Regions:
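Short, small-residue-biased leader/transition segments that mark boundaries at the very start
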Residues: 1-5
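Predominantly a Rossmann-like dinucleotide-binding segment in NAD(P)-dependent oxidoreductases
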Residues: 8-96, 243
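Glycine-rich phosphate/pyrophosphate-binding beta-alpha loops
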Residues: 68, 93, 117-125, 197-198
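C-terminal glycine/acidic-rich active-site capping loop/insertion
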Residues: 103, 108, 135-221, 246, ...
């Protein structure tokens, strides 16, 4: 049995969110967005080694180095996109030739949309995941605090956004948009915190693998899941290189051909077979 080191799956917040989404208590996902810019990297970082931030040595930039954990979590919770359109900027405010600024738009099998934005030139940084669902919304800030909102009707019973759309009159809408706090009558809110220290996630995912090997208990990050993040990163790159929407997974031969063009133009490493 194989595992992949996707240790962020041990974060209690993301486990709770996955449980809520998978349970269906908030209905289907309508859209999701993750802005993850909390890994500022100056030029000195990229100059540490000859392979860093190269097409031939590393295979790309932020999508293969910093963002893989979030690409994994996004798909683990929200599902695997079927279409990808991406605008990736190479060497954005940095003296490198690979992507370090990514804006990705995806579509899921149920028609839901999603965006994933990341860069390495934001020294302040943001880490915020939002998931809009039929029956509410989930917001995670800095991978430490999660707010889960449930829509409610006038009697305080759970309902959907469709129900609110059909039953709210214009007077109620006017009160809501006037900023008088009426919005709190539309939903309930739960807050969850995660204060696990650095290193906890790495040890936990390894302990999980050891327990699986010994007792057969379920893996948090089975090996076959590892390809999902690679596929999405590749689809994002191919879309950016060609300027068009691509399927996910993308055509591996077309991806390899386009990557080799960049490796050859870079002139630092041999092209890939």
């Amino acid at each position: 049995r194989q595992m992949c080191i996707r240790d962020r799956r041990t974060n209690k917040l993301y486990q709770k969110i996955k449980e809520i989404v998978a349970s269906g208590e908030l209905g289907e996902i309508r859209r999701s967005q993750w802005m993850i810019n909390s890994w500022w990297r100056p030029d000195s970082y990229y100059q540490q080694s000859a392979w860093r931030a190269t097409w031939g040595g590393e295979g790309g930039g932020v999508l293969v180095n910093q963002a893989p954990h979030q690409l994994d979590l996004w798909q683990w919770i929200c599902g695997i996109p079927v279409k990808v359109f991406s605008k990736n900027i190479n060497g954005c405010h940095r003296n490198i030739g690979v992507e370090n600024d990514v804006t990705m738009l995806v579509e899921f099998a149920n028609g839901a949309t999603g965006t994933f934005t990341t860069c390495t030139h934001d020294a302040i940084g943001t880490d915020r995941l939002e998931i809009d669902l039929d029956g509410g919304k989930i917001v995670v800030d800095n991978s430490k605090t999660a707010h889960v909102y449930h829509y409610i009707d006038k009697e305080g019973n759970p309902c959907t956004e469709d129900y609110l759309n059909e039953h709210m009159n214009m007077m109620e809408v006017a009160m809501l948009t006037s900023g008088n706090g009426a919005g709190s009558k539309l939903y309930t809110e739960e807050t969850f915190e995660n204060n696990d220290g650095w290193g906890f996630q790495h040890t936990t995912v390894m302990q999980n693998f050891a327990a699986h090997s010994k007792t057969g208990s379920p893996l948090l990050a089975p090996g076959e899941d590892g390809i999902n993040g690679v596929n999405l990163a590749n689809s994002s790159q191919l879309s950016a290189w060609t300027g068009r929407e691509v399927s996910n997974p993308c055509d591996p031969e077309e991806y390899a051909a386009e990557l080799n063009k960049l490796i050859e133009a870079e002139g630092k490493f041999p092209v890939r077979e």
